[in-house]
């Protein structure tokens, strides 16, 4: 066994427990997490976001390899199209949709390892185990482990940035500092929403460990250096990426248009997913406050750190309450929950040890189980619920496939990304269009049309060979163009029903039929 390099003077290394006492329990947690998410992976076809990102990744790879045209994803994606979409397209090429989803599972498993390691360095093995269990018990954690989107990758990178910030304060040196800052920048580039937790990671570098303090320059220096590394990396990336990426960041994140969901609805949804966890974290913060008031000194940074980690769990709900939208909230809350699980691990571990000293170890374990058990039960049900929110598209894609052929024909399909993903080998991306932001120049007058008038004019000219309506996200547009389809001679070739909400009506233009 190699000897460990000494850390900075006066900063003790955390004790390393025996393998069986530390890693085998974590392995059991990871196996349970893998089983819960893998069950979801097999239960449904591609979600629209999955189809979008994987399909975009194939286009980006073709553009990088052969210079083929590619859509301007950087202007409307909420993360760089050259990071996750490219990575997930490779996974999809190797293992199909399940391979892409297993990549997300690997990322989420690594996030669990990161919360275990970070908590172990701060509070010991028992707290680390409890933190990992709490994180795995969450429905959003299980959901992201089976969903091929930006979120799992960005969360995992953010988690390891947080771990290296902890490591920096507990015996790590400049490599930990650089790793924390660079990973923080990479997480933000992977999914822009991850930037919300930049202050949290910097705060960990200030407050964590035996030399954490709000009064010492050394502590502030650590946080500032992490931020400096982050800023340099992000600045260099922004300069290299160009104006389109900056505009895309502003459009999707910084200046995102507000939604129409009420404060109470967004708050209630967030409470449903992570509310119980945050209540336990709040209890941990209050315990730390009492402890700090009694002991003073070094106990105060521990309280401020616990408070920071609790606030991290509130950041996503507060931000989305601010912009009146619950869209993607079930994914975003898991980013902050990762940090809050460190406090939850601490309070559960102290509960176990307190009851062990006064009653019996069994009492302590039972108390922890009474907290984690309901979390896991509810979380498992929530994971299944989230995974069932979209319709199974297998029958729809099979019904549409005979009418789709690579060439110049154009297809107007509501939420087209899923069929475009499954039928990518027999179409070009330019052939697909959804019912949002349709623009058309009138060939007779040269006038630019947009929205419903543009769609109706295109239908009257039979420019769309296939039109698919499902009366969900663009229901008003669907109803407005339905009479135009009938008047222009389009015929309904099939209606496919899928699940509770999926009902796809497939129209084809006059004279257009199945491919030979």
Per-range role (PLM):
Residues 26, 226-231, 292-293, 297-305, ...:
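Signature aromatic-anchored transmembrane alpha helix within multi-pass, membrane-resident enzymes
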Residues 384-394, 398-441, 464-476:
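Short periplasmic/luminal acceptor-recognition loop of GT-C membrane glycosyltransferases, typified by
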Residues 186, 198-296, 301, 316-327, ...:
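Transmembrane-lumen/periplasm boundary regions of multi-pass, lipid-linked membrane glycan transferases
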Residues 194, 318, 322, 347-352, ...:
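Transmembrane alpha-helical segments
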Residues 38-48, 64-85, 94-97, 269:
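Membrane-proximal lumenal/periplasmic loop motifs of glycosylation machinery
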Residues 1-38, 222-226, 306:
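Start-transfer (signal-anchor) and selected internal transmembrane alpha helices
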Residues 122, 126, 161-177, 187, ...:
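Membrane-interface transmembrane helices that cradle and orient dolichyl/undecaprenyl
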Residues 47, 104, 140-154:
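Short acidic/glycine- and proline-prone juxtamembrane loop motifs at membrane-interface regions
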């Amino acid at each position: 066994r190699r000897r460990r390099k000494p850390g900075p003077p006066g900063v003790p290394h955390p004790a390393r427990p025996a393998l069986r006492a530390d890693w085998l329990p974590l392995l059991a947690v990871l196996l349970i997490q893998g089983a819960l998410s893998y069950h979801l992976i097999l239960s449904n076809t591609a979600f629209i976001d999955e189809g979008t990102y994987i399909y975009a990744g194939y286009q980006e790879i073709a553009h990088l390899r052969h210079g083929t045209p590619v859509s301007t994803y950087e202007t409307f994606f909420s993360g760089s199209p050259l990071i996750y979409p490219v990575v997930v397209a490779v996974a999809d090429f190797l293992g199909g949709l399940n391979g892409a989803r297993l990549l997300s599972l690997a990322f989420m498993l690594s996030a669990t390892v990161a919360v275990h390691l970070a908590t172990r360095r701060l509070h010991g093995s028992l707290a680390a185990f409890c933190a990992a269990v709490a994180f795995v018990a969450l429905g959003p954690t299980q959901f992201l482990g089976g969903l091929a989107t930006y979120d799992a990758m960005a969360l995992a990178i953010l988690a390891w940035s947080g771990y290296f910030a902890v490591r920096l304060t507990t015996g790590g040196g400049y490599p930990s500092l650089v790793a924390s800052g660079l990973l923080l920048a990479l997480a933000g580039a992977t999914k822009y929403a991850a930037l919300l937790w930049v202050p949290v990671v910097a705060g960990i570098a200030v407050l964590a460990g035996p030399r954490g303090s709000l009064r010492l320059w050394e502590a502030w220096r650590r946080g500032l250096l992490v931020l400096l590394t982050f800023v340099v990396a992000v600045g260099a990336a922004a300069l290299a990426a160009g104006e389109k990426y900056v505009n895309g960041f502003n459009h999707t994140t910084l200046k995102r248009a507000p939604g129409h969901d009420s404060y109470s609805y967004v708050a209630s949804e967030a409470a449903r997913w992570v509310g119980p966890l945050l209540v336990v974290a709040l209890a941990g913060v209050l315990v730390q406050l009492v402890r700090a008031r009694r002991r003073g000194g070094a106990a105060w940074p521990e309280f401020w750190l616990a408070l920071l980690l609790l606030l991290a769990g509130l950041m996503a709900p507060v931000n989305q309450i601010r912009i009146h939208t619950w869209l993607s909230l079930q994914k975003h809350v898991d980013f902050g929950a990762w940090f809050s699980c460190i406090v939850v691990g601490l309070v559960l571990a102290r509960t176990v040890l307190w009851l062990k000293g006064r009653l019996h170890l069994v009492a302590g374990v039972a108390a922890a189980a009474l907290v984690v058990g309901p979390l896991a039960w509810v979380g498992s049900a929530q994971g299944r619920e989230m995974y069932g929110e979209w319709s199974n598209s297998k029958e729809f894609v099979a019904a549409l496939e005979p009418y789709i052929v690579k060439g110049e024909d154009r297809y107007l399909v509501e939420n087209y990304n899923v069929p475009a993903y499954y039928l990518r080998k027999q179409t070009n991306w330019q052939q697909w269009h959804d019912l949002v932001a349709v623009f058309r120049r009138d060939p007779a007058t040269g006038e630019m049309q947009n929205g419903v008038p543009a769609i109706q004019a295109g239908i009257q000219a039979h420019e769309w060979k296939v039109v698919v309506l499902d009366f969900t996200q663009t229901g008003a547009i669907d109803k407005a163009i339905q009479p135009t389809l009938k008047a222009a001679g389009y015929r309904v070739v099939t209606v496919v029903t899928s699940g509770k909400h999926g009902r796809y009506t497939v129209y084809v233009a006059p004279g257009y039929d199945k491919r030979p």
